[in-house]
UniProtKB/Swiss-Prot annotation:
Keyword hit for Cell division: no
Catalytic reaction annotation: (1S,2R)-1-C-(indol-3-yl)glycerol 3-phosphate + L-serine = D-glyceraldehyde 3-phosphate + L-tryptophan + H2O
Cofactors named for this entry: pyridoxal 5'-phosphate
InterPro entries in UniProt: Trp_synth_b_CS, Trp_synth_beta, Trp_synth_beta/beta-like, TrpB-like_PALP, TrpB-like_PALP_sf
Protein name: Tryptophan synthase beta chain 2
Organism, scientific name: Vibrio parahaemolyticus serotype O3:K6 (strain RIMD 2210633)
Subunit record text: Tetramer of two alpha and two beta chains.
Pfam families the UniProt entry points to: PALP
Encoding gene, per UniProt annotation: trpB2
PANTHER family, per the entry: TRYPTOPHAN SYNTHASE (PTHR48077:SF3), TRYPTOPHAN SYNTHASE-RELATED (PTHR48077)
Reported function: The beta subunit is responsible for the synthesis of L-tryptophan from indole and L-serine.
UniProt record similarity statement: Belongs to the TrpB family.
Keywords, comma-separated and alphabetical: Amino-acid biosynthesis, Aromatic amino acid biosynthesis, Lyase, Pyridoxal phosphate, Tryptophan biosynthesis
Amino acid sequence: MKNSFDHNMPNNEGYFGEYGGSFVPPELEQIMRDINAAYEECCQDPEFKDELARLYKHFVGRPSPIFHAANLSKKYGADIYLKREDLNHTGAHKINHCLGEAILAKKMGKKKLIAETGAGQHGVALATAAALVGLECDIYMGEVDIAKEHPNVVRMRILGANVIPATHGRKTLKEAVDAAFEAYLKDPETQLYAIGSVVGPHPFPKMVRDFQSIIGNEARVQFKEMTGKLPNNLVACVGGGSNAMGLFSAFLEDENVAIHGVEPAGRSLDKVGEHAATLTLGEPGIMHGFKSYMLKDEQGEPQEVHSVASGLDYPSVGPQHSYLKDIGRVNYGSINDDEAIDAFFELSREEGIIPAIESSHAVAYAIKLAQQGESGSILVNLSGRGDKDIDFVVENYGAKYGIESLI
């Protein structure tokens, strides 16, 4: 480790080392300060914490269990465990921060939640939270992802959300963020932009991390109860990086726990626009209101990106991940599309668990660690279930795995 981890991050300006901050138009500066003040007040409010704890237990179904994947473990020679965030209400980790953001918005007197979504999991979770607390909800989603993740689009609409297509650029997650931010600028007084990851201007990277830290806090206790010790390795996929920060946060000071973040290598790391491996190939820059590693084109603008996982195709990453990369605390690797799909089917057929394609990147990396000689324990954050992906996977990859499309 190059430097010791500073647990008191971010600082008051929202910086993790040199990354983070708040780069917003002047008309939003006071709004961001107000959100931060309201959040800090809620952190000290026993009623807020009690309400969130009650909903986590009785609405989400927490704590999510840890499962020993015995069949995969036997096959590959390492003890592979899964933190089952796929079993949460709405099917992923996103509900953890969406409930927090929704309750915060209600306490601030907001009328509407507004957000982007890639795979649709954040959108479904936010629409769910909005329905629960009685707020309107607008979700911006790339036109390509709307077609690809149709089941989640239907869920959002059933829950009462407006799903608004982003039709510019590559029509995926980055464009959805652009469209949501543009809409938010028009009326920041009555809306809360409920950012869907540990990205964006301060206080969102801190706030979303804090809400997601329940994953790691639970996992630390559960793993010790199951095995008598901490895991040798943690593995989680990284797009913006919320599920990963949720797991990693409880183990950052444990130097004997190796931590691995897994980025999407897409079709090729060698071609611009064919991957979204920000920490692997990016450089520091500013986009969407924060400084972090990002993938830039020749003009310094965000690169086009690709991943088979809609929730991972983002040209930047949470600022705390950038900091953890620079100090050497977390190793960031990558998994390509084909490896992720292989892991999608392998976990399904070896353990009876259909994972989200995003989470499949983490499963694939855990398998690769085992194949490379890791014989200790590997705890994978299974961040979501694959219901949303099954039609896309069968249509595009089914023949390779002996499945004919029924459509």
